[in-house]
Curated annotation (Swiss-Prot):
LIM zinc-binding domain location: 23-83, 87-147
Keyword vocabulary terms for this entry: LIM domain, Metal-binding, Repeat, Transcription, Transcription regulation, Zinc
Gene: Lmo4
Protein name in the entry: LIM domain transcription factor LMO4
GO terms for MF: DNA-binding transcription factor binding; metal ion binding; transcription corepressor activity
Cellular component aspect of the GO annotation: cell leading edge; nucleus; RNA polymerase II transcription regulator complex
Originating organism: Mus musculus
Domain of life: Eukaryota
Tissue expression profile of the protein: Expressed in a wide variety of tissues.
Gene3D superfamilies from the UniProt entry: Cysteine Rich Protein (2.10.110.10)
Length: 165
């Protein structure tokens, strides 16, 4: 598990270094089969808990959210922080429980993340280009980009922002 607000990945762990990892929750050595990594720290699966309701977040498939130094379950995150802001395309509010797409710091509803030319929805796995505030599918990227006169700011395969750590 990785903090969604952090671009850092956990440091590599080798078999010989397992005994050196300490749990951020209890301070004990982690000898578990799996290491959990959230908020730049390692955790026992039993110690990674919601700061509000104490629900265990270390189970496979359980999402956790981090904000303001707290680790939260989905329900408490939504209760405390409401929505994700406004969609950069339509300007409407985005509920915190809704999946979003992001490009260059802008946030979009899934339905609003569309090519500026053909209006087709861009979905996870699609390649896209973000140029001067506009989204373009691979097919409709500007001619200047194809000819090498512009640089695409974003041309990686698209992945949804699920806000999981």
């Amino acid at each position: 598990m990785v903090n969604p607000g952090s671009s850092s990945q956990p440091p590599p762990v080798t078999a010989g270094s397992l005994s050196w990892k300490r749990c951020a929750g209890c301070g004990g050595k982690i000898a578990d089969r799996f290491l959990l990594y959230a908020m730049d720290s390692y955790w026992h699966s039993r110690c990674l808990k919601c700061s509000c309701c104490q629900a265990q977040l270390g189970d496979i498939g359980t999402s956790c959210y981090t904000k303001s130094g707290m680790i939260l379950c989905r329900n408490d995150y939504i209760r405390l922080f409401g929505n994700s802001g406004a969609c950069s395309a339509c300007g409407q509010s985005i509920p915190a429980s809704e999946l979003v797409m992001r490009a260059q710091g802008n946030v979009y509803h899934l339905k609003c993340f569309t090519c500026s030319t053909c209006r087709n929805r861009l979905v996870p796995g699609d390649r896209f280009h973000y140029i001067n505030g506009s989204l373009f599918c691979e097919h409709d990227r500007p001619t200047a980009l194809i000819n090498g006169h512009l640089n695409s700011l974003q041309s990686n395969p698209l992945l949804p922002d699920q806000k999981v750590c």
